[in-house]
Amino acid sequence: MEMLDAADLRPAPLPGVEMTFTLAGVPSADVNRALYAMVGARVCWTDRFPWTHADWRAWVERPELSTWLAMAEGTIAGFFELEAQPGGDTEIHLVGLTPAFVGRGYGGYLVEQCTRRAWQRGELWAAGSGPASRVWLRTSTLDHPNAMANYRRRGFKVAAETTGPKLVPDPRVAPWPLPHDPRSASRRFQEEELIT
């Protein structure tokens, strides 16, 4: 899914509590890994299961990547990862709420604020990368049931669709406990992404 102009971003309703968004000033493999596990376990984020600590460090310590923490009620409510890519592209790699904040109406506001910051690359983060000319993300039918509708409500449009197999790991070999067996989800997924 993609957005080609910052003016296309449609605001979400304000959440019932104040949410703040802070750029992680010190890249931390441990923080990103913990948030990936906390948020992603419920929506079949499995692609990074095989990553070593060195893989995580290599990922988060790149100057073009930024990690943002969403706080509400003194608690981490969610996070997102943004990457400044060549040619003005900004990819939203991950965006999601922690389990305690799912179902409370905060998802739209999280995606709105994530997208606002994606458009502000070169200003708020990724110094020297230049302005964004496109913001894009990948999602799938294995994501949260409301994710695709939320992205559309914020102004994202489908750029391309692909259907293919997804390896869904046996939860007994997951690097952290999972709340349910992801193999019960569909083994096929539709991925909406920008194909370059």
Regions found by a protein language model. Name each.
Residues 94-97, 103-120, 134, 146-153:
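Conserved acetyl-CoA-binding loop-helix of GNAT-fold acetyltransferases
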Residues 47, 51-54, 60-67, 71-99:
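A conserved beta-strand-loop-helix scaffold within acyl/acetyltransferase catalytic domains
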Residues 1-18, 153, 157-196:
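Terminal substrate-recognition subdomain of acyl/acetyltransferases
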Residues 5, 94-96, 139:
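Short, structured patches in soluble enzyme cores that scaffold and shape functional sites
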Residues 13-48, 177:
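Short amphipathic alpha-helix that is part of the acyltransferase structural core
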Residues 120-130:
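Alpha-helix termini
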Residues 102, 128-131, 136-147, 164-175:
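Conserved beta-strand-loop-alpha-helix junction that forms the acyl-donor binding cleft
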